[in-house]
């Protein structure tokens, strides 16, 4: 299923499509996760879960029939918020607006007034993107990552 993009993304990345991801994308997603996140890459079981759990918003960015980005959004009705569970773009395609397009598409489909995410405190590039997209740091989770690095909890209040 193709997802319509705002004109900005069509003009800057004319051959990119955002599509709903499925279990058929497991191999491509695993390669992408390992390339992007290396030591933080999700296990095959985690990837299978995110691709099959019916409530998760899962979208992929495709350029020339190749998955070059992915985002998963986790609805949390009890918190009246959605969480960006993971988002990543192939290093060859970073800086071209694909991450922004995936983030916005996921926010829209989560359909909550607030969207949250966690990011490594050292990931300046991602933090910059999130801040430009309206996210603000609301908490620090100390030693959140396996190697002991802190995670920033960022939140965006959407205009609904």
Question: Each PLM stretch: what is its role?
Answer:
Residues 3-9, 20-94, 100-109, 157-159:
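Acetyl-CoA-dependent GNAT
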Residues 9-15:
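Extreme N-terminus of proteins, especially the signal/transit-peptide cleavage junction
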Residues 17, 86-88, 116-118, 153-155:
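Short aromatic/hydrophobic contact patches that present stacked aromatics
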Residues 81-85, 124-130, 135, 142:
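Conserved N-terminal glycine/acidic-rich loop preference
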Residues 99, 103, 122-126, 143-148:
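Short glycine/proline-centered loop/turn elements that form peptide/ligand docking sites
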Residues 103, 109-121, 141:
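Conserved GNAT acetyl-CoA-binding A-motif
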Residues 116-119, 131, 136-153:
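Conserved catalytic-core motifs of GNAT/GCN5-like acyltransferases
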